[in-house]
Structures are given as structure tokens and as C-alpha cells.
Regions:
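Conserved catalytic core of two-metal-ion nucleotidyltransferases
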Residues: 1-8, 16-23, 56-119, 132-140
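Active-site nucleotide-donor binding segment shared across nucleotidyl transfer reactions
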Residues: 2-58
Length: 207
């Protein structure tokens, strides 16, 4: 449903703004990228622009397109990302070469912020536009991650910080927060550890 909604919004934006001046790929990240969105979810997305993009000439078009689609998703119930990881943010609306530079830096300099970003942007999935831009990014990034053992070890260490809701005796470890006592956060204590593990194994295999 989210993919169909996004593509309809892209088509509406094209009718309003005209055809895109350079090729682009609209890409979903996070839970939408992994096809695991729940009923209550925010939006994570980005734009990969062709390297022929020039900010002075084409910037206004893609800013307007991103704003239209992100606003439309919010109106449909896919609320704005609290971390601003959306195509409407100029940081995540850049050329293919800039995306390749982002990933190269995150992989070769895996500080805590880089690891946080990779947990979002390694889970990308093409939604609309020119698919070859997305494929080119994957072909560049996956081999780079696969052969960097230091990066993968940092990803493993980061994954181990997200623990399942189990105590030392194998029983359930309940949430002790006053607002929701005797509860379990299924996202952070069940889904995230599995996703983190799957991501590490996938990157190690170049998938």
C-alpha cells in the first residue's frame, strides 16, 4: 500500500511540475525498505539523482517534488520521520556519486553516527523513477561492505547492543517503565535484533 501510495504521489507531482529534468530514483529506507511496516509507522525515503544534476538548474524541481511526496505521505498517515531521514532533507537528496561517497565514508569510518545511518540506508528498496541509478549504487556499495572486515565487526558490535527481551534464566524480561509496566517493546526487543542479525549476514555475503 505504501509503495502504491508513493508512486501515485510521484505521478501527481510529475503532472503538477512537469517531467523530471534529469533521471532520479525514489528509494524507500528503514521499515518500508524492508517491507515490514506496521499500522503505525513513519516514513524513511531518499532520492538518488543522476550525476548530470546541477543544483542551480534542477534543484528547485526536486525540492518541490520531494516536498509534495513527503507531505502527501504524511497526509496519508505515514508521518514525517522524527530524524528527518526523508527526501525533503537536502542531505538525502543528492547525486549517485554523492551517495557512493556517503556509503564509502560510513564503511571506512564506522563511528556511532555512521553505524546508525547504515542501519537505515543499507535497507534501501527502489520505489519509482529510474531503477538503474539504484542498481548502480548497490553494485558499488555491497562489494565494498563485504570486503571490509573492520566495518562488519563494528556492525556486529552494534547489533549486540539490541538485546531480546530475555533474562538470564531464559524467561521474559519485562519493561519496567512506569508508563507501560509489565510490557515488552516488540520492535526494539524482538524485531530489531533479528533485523540487525539478518543485515550483518546479508552484507557479509554481498547481498
Amino acid at each position: 500500500i505504501t509503495d502504491a501510495t508513493t508512486n501515485q504521489l510521484l505521478a501527481m507531482a510529475h503532472r503538477r511540475l512537469g517531467p523530471p529534468p534529469v533521471p532520479y530514483a525514489w528509494v524507500a529506507a528503514g521499515s518500508q525498505g524492508r517491507l515490514e511496516q506496521t499500522a503505525k509507522t513513519d516514513q524513511d525515503n531518499c532520492l538518488i539523482l543522476d550525476d548530470s544534476f546541477e543544483e542551480a538548474t534542477h534543484g528547485a524541481y526536486f525540492k518541490a517534488l520531494s516536498t509534495f511526496v513527503c507531505d502527501g505521505l504524511n497526509a496519508c498517515g505515514y508521518v514525517y520521520c522524527p530524524g528527518n531521514m526523508m527526501a525533503v532533507n537536502p542531505q538525502w537528496r543528492v547525486t549517485l556519486s554523492q551517495w557512493q561517497n556517503y556509503f564509502e565514508r560510513w564503511i571506512t569510518q564506522p563511528d556511532p553516527n555512521a553505524l546508525m545511518l547504515t542501519c537505515v540506508f543499507f535497507d534501501l528498496r527502489f520505489i519509482g523513477g529510474t531503477a538503474s541509478l539504484f542498481q548502480s549504487l548497490q553494485e558499488e556499495v555491497f562489494p565494498l561492505a563485504q570486503k571490509n572486515g573492520i566495518f562488519l565487526s563494528h556492525m556486529v558490535a552494534n547489533a549486540l547492543t539490541h538485546r531480546p527481551a530475555l533474562n538470564w534464566w531464559g524467561g521474559l524480561s519485562w519493561n519496567q517503565a512506569k508508563r507501560h509496566p509489565k510490557s515488552i517493546n516488540l520492535k526494539h526487543n524482538a524485531i530489531v535484533p533479528i533485523v540487525d542479525l539478518a543485515r550483518v549476514y546479508a552484507l557479509a555475503e554481498g547481498i
